[in-house]
A protein has these predicted regions:
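Residue-level hotspots at or immediately adjacent to binding/recognition sites across diverse folds
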Residues: 20-371
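Transmembrane helix-bundle segments that form internal channels/tunnels in multi-pass membrane proteins
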Residues: 9-11, 32
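Sec-dependent signal peptide recognition
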Residues: 2-8
Length: 371
């Protein structure tokens, strides 16, 4: 690890990236608020082919924002008074599914910024649907609930949807789902059963990590495919795939005082972990370290309405910029630290490894659907 850190510092000296004394590589440039009252923002979904960010929150709050100029926004139809908790774009980028409390499953269309019910609440048992993710080819979406139910769903024509319950959750709350194109699998983070994997035949298998309560998971398909899960007890799981063998490695953050809340992927495939109190760190898989990105010290010092809330979403802007949104509706632009500021070093967050916690051989490689 010392050799890796030395190599990183040498590389750092060769590139124009500036780093503040507190270890941040980004700073807040400006911010604005969505409204006078707290909209309870829970999620922001973006697609590389779309210019619109879908933002959802409490009591049916839903807007579509221009990703480069989010003050340009379109309120979506008020068709639900339930809290909306998660959203995901179809791989085609033209529609997105939104899920929430009381069996809420909505469909957003970019073409006319319409919002409609994608299926009845009864079809998902009126459960609190807290996560949704499309598989890589867009044939099926997987929906998970806080009650421990898991469904797969696809359009069935005439505005209706086919809903199929999936067994094997053990009744554990499903916190998050994300999918890969190759291997053609989806990974599931749960509160009690650990981390699971859905194969191309829609079979759920648990691969390990049941000692932690996993809150979020993200998969990166570029380069070597990997999925990263986080838990509020500061555990980080890396799921890797090699020749049909799935490996699960769990580590813990030791030099970090925040509570990880969510994990996301930027357009440049940086893996960012958002924590409370408000802070963002960057995780680099395969033992390459976890580093400060925007520290809580910087957020408190710069304020802009971010420090007293929880960061609940983010997306890339232009030319290395990054937008974040907080639960209380503050939208802030992050920009790279300027060359010439007082130089510090990115802080390396210590990772204590628990070793390989689970390995399973399964025929998953190159299993894209023929449809």
């Amino acid at each position: 690890m010392a050799a890796r850190l030395l190599a990183f510092l040498i590389l750092l000296a060769m590139v124009p990236t500036a780093i503040a004394e507190d270890g941040s590589v980004m700073r807040i440039d400006h911010s604005f608020t969505l409204m006078e009252y707290d909209p309870g923002i829970e999620d922001a979904a973006i697609h590389p082919a779309s210019n619109w960010v879908v933002v959802v929150g409490a009591e049916g709050y839903a807007v579509s924002m221009d990703k480069s100029s989010p003050s340009t926004m379109i309120p979506l139809a008020d068709i639900s008074d339930s809290d909306l908790l998660d959203s995901d774009y179809h791989p085609g980028g033209n529609t997105a599914l939104i899920v929430g409390e009381n069996g809420s499953v909505l469909r957003y269309a970019i073409s006319d910024h319409s919002l409609e019910r994608a299926t009845s609440a009864q079809s998902v048992g009126y459960d609190t649907m807290q996560t949704v993710s499309w598989n890589a080819n867009g044939e099926w979406a997987y929906l998970g609930s806080s009650e421990g139910t898991l469904y797969r769903m696809r359009p069935a024509g005439n505005g209706s949807s086919e809903i199929v319950p999936m067994p094997g959750t053990g009744g554990s709350a499903i916190s998050s789902i994300d999918c890969l194109p190759d291997p053609f699998v989806c990974l599931v983070a749960s509160a009690e059963e650990g981390i699971g994997m859905i194969d191309r035949d829609h079979v759920l298998s648990w691969i390990g990590g049941s000692s932690s309560t996993w809150s979020d998971i993200v998969c990166r398909s570029g380069g070597v495919p990997v999925c990263i899960a986080i838990s509020m007890d500061r555990s980080i799981a890396e799921i890797e795939f090699e020749s049909g063998v799935v490996g699960l490695d769990i580590q813990t953050l030791d030099g970090f005082s925040g509570t990880p809340r969510s994990i996301s992927l930027t357009s440049s495939e940086q893996i960012l972990i958002t924590a409370t109190p408000a802070e963002i760190i960057e995780h680099r898989p395969s033992g390459d370290g976890t580093f400060t990105w925007l520290t809580n010290e910087a957020i408190v010092g710069q304020s802009f309405g971010v420090s007293g809330s929880t960061i609940t979403g983010g997306w890339d802007g232009d030319s290395g910029d990054h937008w974040i949104i907080t639960r209380d509706g503050t939208v802030a632009l992050l920009v790279p630290e300027e060359t010439g500021v007082a130089q510090g070093l990115p802080k390396l967050v210590t990772m204590l490894s628990f070793g390989i916690m689970g390995v399973m051989a399964i025929g998953i490689w190159s299993t894209r659907s023929s449809r």
